[in-house]
Amino acid sequence: TLRLRLIVIHRTLTMKIQFIGATREVTGSKHLITTDSGHTILLDCGMYQGKGMETDAANRDLGFDPKTLDCIVLSHAHIDHSGLIPYVVKMGFKGDIYCTPATRDLCSLMLTDTAFIQEQDVRMYNKKIDRQHPHKEKGKTYKVEPLYNQNDVNRAMKLFVTYSFDRRFRLFDDVLLTFTNSGHMLGGAVCSLEIYE
């Protein structure tokens, strides 16, 4: 569960909030904030969890261009909140990923494990496709690729910037962030954004 406290200090509000994931289902938490000054902040970057090509397609369709993000704020390390971070890095995200130190440490383990599981699942799926399509049509590709691999995880982990609980810090001139212990899991935080427009 994402716990967010948003404080907006402004007379007229034109900031945009898009609820991209975890709206009609439990997994895939992603919430995009665009401030009046044009900063784009992604709150969590969760993976849809399930089996089959429908889940794969949902994870590949992010609902935003990763190259346009300024930063990611991560509430905790559960994969339905953090699992697509290496994928957005693979797709061009280059900003900072803000979280608590424990969340970063857990993400290092959990995202590595997720990459390994994807590689195993894809290997098995591709073998199944080979058996089902022994006489493939020329020029058609039936194989699938994992969303990301260990190299993508390593690149993503270099973007993590950590702050301890109850320490208020500045994301941008007009945006402050404080992590407060949520009690949800080790390192899990209520993310309090103060946006001065």
Regions found by a protein language model. Name each.
Residues T1, D121, H184:
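Short regulatory "switch" loops immediately downstream of catalytic or recognition motifs
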Residues K158-F165:
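Short acidic-hydrophobic, aromatic-tinged amphipathic segments that line or gate anion-handling sites
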